[in-house]
């Protein structure tokens, strides 16, 4: 029987990889999930084994795109083949098995990745805490674990191995199935509930005849570390400033110090041909609504006069270097979370260049997000909010400071300027709260100028432009977006006491209500938090509507978190209409948990805070893949992703604090063609984190506003005892070549 299985294994390797030994991806690695279950990475075809194998399986997964000897990225997947072996009997500690060209020694002291837990650690105030056990064995399916339910697990202290707590393994709910046949996790999942254990320290889990977990921490410092890494993801994406020691070991020169005044509109949504918009957007000479490519429009409409403005500030949007209007959400949300929990944020907390100026670092980071916009604000108050060029930078063009393209700031519009007014006035409120009087006055003055421009209908953006050798026209909406009008008006009223800022809002309440009902799903959950923090009598109804929607969404998330999947996550239920919409970071638990921290602030109810803690657990490794979702965070984290700076900086490890988009529900067609072929449908949905870098943008890229900032906002709210960063965090060095990191060939 064993010989037959061995021959089948050789055949499977040829079928799955299409290669002999010399064509396989890299050196052989192995790990034991249990004393009886071995995983070999990149196995050699074999005809014998020293131990009887009762089951064996295979899977292959891309790690990234292949690099040639010069470091050039090829349109070829670097694939790892995973071979799974279940032996007839468990190995003893120190016993060696010879199999698939490998001598694998079982060492009970080596942590098993069958344990899925928060790799950064839990705070001491977290009311519910869970780790999980589970594994997916490729075409073998779930590792059987149901028989362990009811058995004991231990928490052992790392320093001496002493058992400090015991609990009972429990089965989590059955795996959900999409349309009855596609699993979400592919696992049988056990739960380790340690909610009643809160003693600070370093520990690991132990289960007899299974093994031990990696270390985990219970301490407030774990939350400080998570917030630090996430928030510094923004610092590492700053534009216009050199990143240097002592603030980071991931150094790069200052970039994009200047910008030219451009002529094109700054609302990205208008460039797409809408289905219903008839009186705003782009139009041909016959007044038909048309779609326009922004790169082409910028090329075809250079400035009438070259006016160069020094404007460092803002953040690179993602892998490339544009600075977008969406980033104003970051400014607003960082300021809002400070107003929600000012006791959580202090000066010096993030080790950034502004640390030591007496202002909480989170507000300094928010201020960087408007620094460039202050520089381009026109005398009449108008602000262009999109900094863009004529094409995407690419591999081989070097660091951002080497970019040869000119950047242009979009023409001011009423709505873009009002969005700026809403964000910068929120920052002014936060600066005032922090006692930073001069900064608050500076941002207030800019917000007032922006308001005066935006509130004037005569400043509606209307223009003629050239596009592909034809003349086209553009006109923005004849109205102001309700969310920004209300937020800016209320903020300015609170800052000045002048009711004139409320009058346009009161006059437009009906349309604002309609906008809220239709479009709130697109807004940040913190958009109208100001109505809760500083109630204005005239807007009591809107405040109540805001509360209702936040609490409705939060309740649904908590229900899904507890009852839908084996691992507690905030994603839509398996049979919900939006379950497929995972791509572009929508799936991220810390992004979704912003709703939960809003609900907690509105009500003070512990359940919402607990839900946000559990979302942080999932993000940090208590998930089906057993990985942290953010580079440099935890022990197994994304080792490579689409990031042009990390490609060019000659630093082995990619920049920390970046949260790639990750799961996409479907599988990228490039991955199907290059890796999975007919096996694609067999990959469980929560394992569909395809990484082919620029060939799989919806999963391999990221953005500062979709994935990085929300994680900083949520973890900032969760902080229990804010402190200055440890010397270890401040002095962290790159770990080395990214292919050597545990996250590169992590289990699929």
Identify what each model region corresponds to:
Residues 89-112:
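Acidic, Ser/Thr/Gly/Pro-rich low-complexity segments and short DxT(G/T)-type signature motifs
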Residues 87-93, 195-200:
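Surface-exposed, short loops/turns at beta-strand junctions within beta-sandwich domains
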């Amino acid at each position: 029987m064993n010989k037959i299985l061995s021959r089948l294994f050789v055949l499977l390797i040829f079928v799955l990889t299409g290669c002999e030994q010399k064509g396989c991806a890299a050196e052989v690695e192995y790990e034991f999930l249990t004393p009886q279950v071995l995983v070999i990475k990149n196995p050699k075809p074999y005809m014998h084994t020293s131990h009887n194998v009762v089951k064996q399986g295979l899977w292959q997964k891309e790690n990234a795109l292949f690099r040639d000897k010069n470091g050039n990225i090829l349109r070829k997947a670097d694939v790892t083949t995973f071979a799974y072996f279940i032996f007839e009997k468990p190995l003893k500690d120190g016993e060696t098995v010879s199999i698939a060209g490998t001598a694998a020694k079982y060492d009970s002291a080596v942590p098993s990745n069958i344990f899925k837990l928060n790799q950064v650690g839990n705070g001491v105030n977290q009311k519910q805490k869970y780790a999980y056990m589970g594994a997916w064995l490729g075409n073998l399916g779930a590792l059987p674990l149901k028989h362990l339910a009811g058995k004991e697990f231990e928490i052992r202290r790392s320093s001496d191995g002493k058992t400090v707590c015991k609990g009972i393994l429990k089965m989590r709910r059955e795996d959900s199935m999409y349309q009855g046949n596609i699993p979400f996790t592919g696992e049988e999942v056990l739960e380790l509930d340690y909610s009643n254990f809160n003693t600070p320290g370093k520990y690991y889990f132990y289960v007899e005849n299974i093994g031990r977990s990696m270390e985990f921490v219970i301490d407030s410092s774990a939350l400080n570390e998570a917030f630090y890494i996430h928030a510094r993801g923004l610092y590492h994406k700053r534009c216009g400033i050199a990143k240097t020691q002592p603030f980071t070991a991931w150094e790069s020169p200052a970039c994009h110090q200047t910008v030219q005044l451009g002529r094109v509109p700054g609302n990205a949504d208008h460039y797409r041909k809408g289905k219903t918009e008839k009186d705003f957007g782009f139009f041909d000479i016959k007044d038909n609504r048309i779609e326009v490519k922004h790169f082409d429009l910028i090329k075809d409409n250079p400035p009438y006069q070259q006016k160069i403005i020094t404007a460092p500030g803002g953040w690179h949007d993602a892998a490339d270097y544009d600075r977008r209007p969406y980033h104003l959400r970051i400014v607003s949300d960082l300021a809002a979370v400070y107003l929600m929990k000012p006791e959580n944020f202090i000066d010096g907390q993030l080790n950034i260049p502004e640390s030591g100026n007496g202002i909480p670092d989170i507000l300094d980071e928010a201020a960087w997000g408007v620094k460039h916009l202050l520089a381009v604000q026109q005398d009449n108050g108008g602000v262009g909010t999109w900094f863009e060029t004529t094409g995407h930078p690419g591999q081989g063009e070097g660091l951002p400071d080497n970019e040869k393209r000119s950047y242009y700031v979009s023409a001011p519009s009423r709505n873009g300027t009002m969005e700026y007014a809403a964000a910068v006035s929120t920052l002014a409120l936060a600066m005032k709260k922090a006692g930073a009087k001069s900064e608050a006055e500076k941002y207030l003055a800019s917000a007032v100028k922006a308001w005066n421009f935006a509130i004037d209908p005569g400043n509606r953006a209307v223009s003629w432009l050239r596009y592909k050798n034809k003349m086209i026209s553009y006109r923005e909406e004849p109205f102001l977006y309700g969310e920004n009008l209300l937020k800016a008006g209320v903020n300015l009223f609170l800052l000045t006491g002048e009711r004139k800022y409320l009058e346009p809002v009161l006059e437009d309440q009906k349309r604002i209500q309609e906008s809220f009902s239709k479009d709130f799903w697109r807004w940040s959950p913190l958009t109208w938090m100001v109505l809760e923090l500083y109630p204005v009598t005239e807007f009591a109804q809107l405040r109540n509507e805001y509360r209702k929607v936040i609490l409705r969404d939060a309740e649904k998330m908590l229900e899904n978190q507890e009852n839908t999947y084996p691992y507690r996550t905030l994603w839509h239920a398996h049979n919900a209409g939006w379950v497929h919409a995972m791509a572009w970071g929508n799936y991220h638990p810390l992004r979704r948990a912003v709703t939960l921290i809003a609900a907690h602030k509105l009500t003070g109810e512990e359940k919402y805070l607990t839900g946000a803690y559990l979302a942080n657990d999932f993000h940090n490794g208590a998930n089906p893949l057993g990985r942290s979702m953010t580079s440099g965070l935890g022990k197994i984290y994304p080792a490579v992703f689409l990031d042009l700076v990390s490609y060019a900086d000659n630093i082995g490890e990619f920049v920390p604090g970046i949260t790639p988009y990750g799961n996409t529900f479907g599988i990228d067609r490039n991955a199907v063609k290059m890796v999975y072929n007919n096996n694609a449908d067999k990959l469980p949905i929560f394992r569909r984190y395809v990484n082919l870098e620029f060939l799989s943008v919806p999963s391999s890229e990221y953005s500062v506003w979709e994935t990085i900032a929300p994680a900083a906002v949520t973890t900032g709210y969760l902080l229990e005892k804010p402190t200055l960063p440890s010397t270890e965090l401040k002095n962290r060095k790159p770990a080395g070549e990214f292919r050597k990191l545990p996250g590169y060939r992590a289990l699929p």
